């Protein structure tokens, strides 16, 4: 067993997680300026524990958000009675963060209590004599070795007298990996925000004593999927992109009785930013899709249903794609029940992530769940969950915590990702649990589950981790549905939802701010255990 799952992004958070939480906090209503104020005040309070009022504190500040945190700390320390000097390593007009600029302007007015030095040349960045030196040069966004003037400032911090306090992460340390490819601050204490960062835990020799503090980011900014997840995890195409480099998806579905489901999944995948979408289905299904010329048909001949004789053809096609969605409208004929597990296993053997939906879930419930090392994503609703795992859930109006923990237990046991659909979607890989609250009641129309499967497969093909792909797909599918509902009301269809996927995916923050406010649906509460406190090196 891997231990008790946590609600949110894990016990430690990456640099991308930090950006996601900041953006989601702002969406909820806690602005970045407020987060910066809280962060800087927390730094000041920790610095005040290291030296008595009247002592000298020097803050080395950069132009980004980390520097802004340091400027806030300087303001609070001046109020507490410390002799405060701020060394700005760039000119004020070069401050790139609007929040940091606002904090600098406030500090610039404090001409009686704060000494500000602008480093206009490398010679202006020199070691200082102080009781506490605060490193607010570079934060979690660092990639590669610091360059001048940052590297010069880092050397100045290390050569200064006094205790070294790093803001969020020591400058020069990669907060995700713990690597130090160039100059880095060797801190005595690091005050990090919200949760520990992996690099800090790996390099106590650089971070020193670790203190985790709250900056007022709501737990919901991490537990609920939000527009920040889309904005910071789904990357736009590179200018160096070529056909296929942004992902290729295979949709396998359809049967004698169901034609539309795999077509909807294919159209949703196409609108989710992949380059190529293949639709493998019985011949009458691919004929029905022929008026969508951008979908590549792969007719499965010889049977009106997916048949074991089709497996070899599909196995060859797997080498040409990056992800697969299977199960939409396949039916439950005996030949299909035999073929579907074979196709899934072949895909997993080739290290292709697989999304299983609808009838595919029912077939796995009967035939068994293959081992996938978390490359398998299943998207059941409540009844399908019971069929797949043989264990009933409490009703959708019951305790969200109980439902989530049961789903996490199944995900952990079987080594897969579960996207449990409902008024509040639950996404879990057995270690982490996230919730999604986008969507509208009108999404009860047929086909919205098929669109969800297609979006998930597309995000997997775009190289997102399965847990994040499923989480973001739930958010985008629900947001697109809400956007469609805003125009069509109860007349909306799954096709209307598909047309809104680009807006939800490409402008998530703006789009999320235009849909009706969330209505509280959750029954019960989750456990949130803040990691605030000290971790000795």
Curated annotation (Swiss-Prot):
GO terms for biological process, alphabetical: metabolite repair; nicotinamide nucleotide metabolic process
Protein's UniProt keywords contain Nucleotide-binding? yes
What are the YjeF C-terminal domain coordinates in residue numbering?
226-508
User: Could you say which residues bind ADP here?
Assistant: 421-425, 440-449
Q: Which cofactor does it need?
A: K(+)
Q: For this protein, what is the EC number?
A: 4.2.1.136, 5.1.99.6
Residues noted as binding (6S)-NADPHX 1 in the record, renumbered to the chain? 150, 168
Kindly state which keywords UniProt assigns to this record, in alphabetical order.
ATP-binding, Isomerase, Lyase, Metal-binding, Multifunctional enzyme, NAD, NADP, Nucleotide-binding, Potassium
* Segments for region (NADPHX 2): 381-387
Cite the YjeF N-terminal domain residue spans from the record.
Answer: 13-223
Q: Where is this region: NADPHX 1?
A: 65-69, 139-145
Cofactor binding description: Binds 1 potassium ion per subunit.
Q: Which GO terms describe its molecular function?
A: ADP-dependent NAD(P)H-hydrate dehydratase activity; ATP binding; metal ion binding; NAD(P)HX epimerase activity
Q: Where does (6S)-NADPHX 2 bind?
A: 329, 450
Stretch list, region ADP-dependent (S)-NAD(P)H-hydrate dehydratase: 227-537
Region described as NAD(P)H-hydrate epimerase = 1-227
Q: Which residues form the signal peptide?
A: none
Q: Which family does it belong to?
A: In the N-terminal section; belongs to the NnrE/AIBP family. In the C-terminal section; belongs to the NnrD/CARKD family.
Q: What does this protein do?
A: Bifunctional enzyme that catalyzes the epimerization of the S- and R-forms of NAD(P)HX and the dehydration of the S-form of NAD(P)HX at the expense of ADP, which is converted to AMP. This allows the repair of both epimers of NAD(P)HX, a damaged form of NAD(P)H that is a result of enzymatic or heat-dependent hydration.
The protein's name: Bifunctional NAD(P)H-hydrate repair enzyme Nnr
Q: Which organism is it from?
A: Hyperthermus butylicus (strain DSM 5456 / JCM 9403 / PLM1-5)
- Organismal lineage: Archaea, Thermoproteota, Thermoprotei, Desulfurococcales, Pyrodictiaceae
């Amino acid at each position: 067993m891997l231990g008790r799952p946590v609600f949110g992004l894990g016990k430690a958070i990456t640099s991308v997680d930090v950006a996601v939480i900041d953006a989601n906090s702002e969406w909820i209503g806690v602005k970045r300026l407020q987060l910066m104020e809280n962060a800087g005040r927390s730094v000041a309070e920790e610095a005040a524990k290291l030296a008595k009022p009247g002592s000298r504190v020097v803050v080395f500040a950069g132009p980004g958000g980390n520097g802004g945190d340091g400027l806030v700390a300087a303001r609070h320390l001046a109020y507490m009675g410390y002799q405060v000097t701020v060394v700005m390593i760039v000119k004020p007009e070069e401050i790139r963060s609007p929040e940091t600029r606002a904090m600098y302007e406030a500090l610039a007015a404090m001409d009686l209590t704060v000494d500000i030095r602008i480093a206009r040349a490398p010679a202006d960045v020199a070691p200082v004599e102080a009781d506490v030196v605060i490193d607010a040069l570079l934060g979690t966004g660092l990639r590669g070795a610091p360059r001048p003037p940052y590297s010069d400032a880092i050397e100045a911090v290390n050569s200064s007298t006094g205790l070294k306090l790093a803001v969020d992460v020591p400058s020069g340390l990669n907060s995700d990996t713990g690597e130090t490819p160039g100059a880095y601050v060797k801190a005595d204490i690091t005050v990090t925000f919200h949760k520990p960062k992996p690099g800090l835990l790996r390099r106590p020799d650089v971070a020193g004593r670790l203190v985790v503090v709250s900056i007022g980011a709501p737990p919901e900014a991490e537990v609920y999927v939000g527009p920040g997840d889309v904005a910071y995890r789904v990357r736009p195409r590179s200018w160096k992109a070529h056909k296929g480099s942004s992902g290729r998806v295979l949709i396998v579905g359809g049967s004698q009785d169901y034609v539309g489901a795999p077509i909807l999944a294919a159209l949703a995948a196409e609108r989710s930013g992949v380059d190529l979408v293949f639709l493998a289905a019985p011949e009458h299904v691919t004929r029905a899709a022929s008026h969508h010329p951008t979908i590549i048909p792969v007719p499965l001949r010889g049977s009106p249903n997916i048949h074991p004789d089709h497996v070899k053809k599909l196995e060859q096609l797997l080498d040409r794609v990056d992800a697969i969605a299977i199960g939409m409208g396949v039916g439950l004929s005996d030949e299909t029940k035999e073929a579907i597990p074979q196709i899934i296993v072949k895909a997993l053997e080739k290290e292709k992530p697989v999304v299983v939906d609808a009838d595919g879930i029912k077939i796995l419930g009967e035939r068994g769940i293959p081992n996938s090392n978390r490359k398998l994503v299943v998207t059941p609703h409540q009844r399908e969950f019971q069929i797949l795992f043989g264990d009933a859930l409490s009703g959708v109006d019951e305790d969200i915590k109980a439902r989530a923990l049961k789903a996490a237990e199944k995900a952990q046991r079987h080594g897969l990702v579960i996207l449990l659909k409902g008024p509040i979607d639950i996404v879990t890989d057995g270690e982490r649990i996230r919730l999604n609250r986008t969507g509208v009641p009108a999404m009860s129309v047929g086909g919205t589950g098929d669109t969800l499967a297609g979006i998930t497969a597309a995000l997997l093909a775009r190289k997102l981790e399965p847990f994040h792909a499923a989480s973001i797909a739930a958010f985008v599918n629900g947001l697109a549905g809400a956007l469609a509902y805003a125009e069509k009301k109860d007349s909306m269809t799954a096709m209307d939802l598909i047309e809104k996927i680009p807006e939800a995916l490409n402008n998530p923050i703006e789009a999320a701010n235009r849909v009706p406010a969330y209505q509280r649906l959750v029954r019960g509460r989750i456990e949130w255990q803040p990691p605030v406190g000290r971790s000795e090196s």
